[in-house]
Amino acid sequence: MSTESMIQDVELAEEALPRKTAGPQGSRRCWFLSLFSFLLVAGAATLFCLLHFGVIGPQREEFPKDPSLISPLAQAVRSSSRTPSDKPVAHVVANPQAEGQLQWLNRRANALVANGVELTDNQLVVPSEGLYLIYSQVLFKGQGCPSNHVLLTHTISRIAVSYQTKVNLLSAIKSPCQRETPEGAEAKPWYEPIYLGGVFQLEKGDRLSAEINLPDYLDFAESGQVYFGIIAL
């Protein structure tokens, strides 16, 4: 049997089928299409309502209710955002022009001394009694490791009005070199940041200083790497 004769037989068989069966099949197909369209529209409307009323979607960041679980810096940010900006605050930066010393500047675009705080003799003078967040960061940079052990220190000190003695509030020591660079080997660069921060009860007239032991290793390549500041809570 040829292919053409098989096709003709199939066409004749289709013509021989009762024409009345086409009616119920068409009605059933229309019913299914209507049901599918209804479910699609209902699902889209439900999803829109859930998104609109916040039942689903990105979760909001929540702060813990226990204040002890919040870092001092986070508490300072929350406190300052809810109160008028009349609290003492200072953020000073290092002078990249001062060779061999760490000198703080307040007359820069990214520096601030306000609401009674003063920068005197490279120290921040506290204008009123209260809790303060004190912070500072330095960045050291070097090339290779010498034979003598390199110890980098960063310290925040306080000279209180009640007793004229310098007392360390925060201090850290780091060593960037574990071993001496072998003779003839490539001297690779190293970087060592030190950050200090904490909350302290201060008195009016207290003086605060942030100091290091090896200023020749300070990195001033980018602004905002070496700074010192206080925020009244």
Swiss-Prot record:
Glycosylation sites: S80
Lipidation (N6-myristoyl lysine): K20
Disulfide bonds: C145-C177
GO biological process, one term: positive regulation of canonical NF-kappaB signal transduction
Oligomeric and partner information: Homotrimer. Interacts with SPPL2B.
Site (described: Cleavage): S34, L35, L39, L40, C49, L50, L51, H52, A76, V77
Organism this protein belongs to: Macaca fascicularis (Crab-eating macaque)
Any one GO molecular-function label of the UniProt entry: tumor necrosis factor receptor binding
CDD domains xref list: TNF (cd00184)
GO cellular component: cell surface; extracellular space; plasma membrane
Protein origin, superkingdom: Eukaryota
Localisation: Cell membrane
Family classification: Belongs to the tumor necrosis factor family.
Entries under Gene3D superfamilies matching the protein: 2.60.120.40
Name of this chain's protein: Tumor necrosis factor
Keyword list, A-Z: Cell membrane, Cytokine, Disulfide bond, Glycoprotein, Lipoprotein, Membrane, Myristate, Phosphoprotein, Secreted, Signal-anchor, Transmembrane, Transmembrane helix
